[in-house]
Swiss-Prot record:
Residues 143-152 have a biased composition (Basic and acidic residues). GO terms for molecular function: RNA binding; structural constituent of ribosome. It comes from Kineococcus radiotolerans (strain ATCC BAA-149 / DSM 14245 / SRS30216). The keyword Ribonucleoprotein applies. Pfam families: Ribosomal_S9 (PF00380). The gene is rpsI. This is Small ribosomal subunit protein uS9. One of its GO terms (biological process) is translation. Residues 9-19 have a biased composition (Acidic residues). GO terms for cellular component: cytoplasm; small ribosomal subunit.
Length: 167
């Protein structure tokens, strides 16, 4: 009657098989040791308004690449440039990582906020003990929940009502 195999039977067959071992070791590779946080690359996602930024940081010289463009070209506004660089300034890691980011949606302010959150989350993932307290205190790990309020029927905008005439 058992024409079909259950998921549990398949899992048992795989775990009993000699093909699948728990760990893989190579004689040529060095054993992994936890340690220097500057060596590990990190990645994270940041969101703000309608913008989404996928961020990857790797050890380097502080070069920013956003959608294939430099930081100065992508964010010509100096306020936005300072905004996205704040997580590095707070953690005193300015110039020690290269940032590669893909951003879509939203406007320039939302994209800058999304990029800042993504960079902060990536720094947090690289070295939790060293970076998290500074980033948390500065408020960089908190996603800004504010979004555009929808327009309601019978109103001109989200809250603006047509002019009221008493008589």
């Amino acid at each position: 009657m058992s024409e079909y195999t259950t998921e549990a039977d398949t899992v048992e067959d795989i775990t009993e098989s000699d093909e699948f071992t728990g760990t893989y070791t190579s004689e040529s590779s060095t054993p992994a040791t936890g340690g220097n946080s500057i060596i590990a690359p990190g990645g994270a996602t940041g969101r703000r308004k309608e913008a989404v930024a996928r961020v990857r940081i790797v050890p380097g010289t502080g070069k920013w690449t956003i959608n294939g463009r430099e930081l100065d070209n992508y964010f010509p506004n100096k306020v936005h440039q300072q905004l996205v660089n704040e997580p590095f300034r707070v953690t005193a890691l300015e110039g020690s990582f290269d940032v590669i980011a893909r951003i879509h949606g939203g406007g320039s302010s939302g994209q800058a906020g999304a990029l800042r959150l993504g960079v902060a989350r990536a720094l947090n993932a690289i070295d939790l003990e060293a970076n998290r307290p500074q980033l948390k205190k500065a408020g960089f790990l908190t996603r800004d929940p504010r979004a555009t309020e929808r327009k309601k029927a019978g109103l001109k905008k989200a809250r603006k009502a047509p002019q009221f005439s008493k008589r």
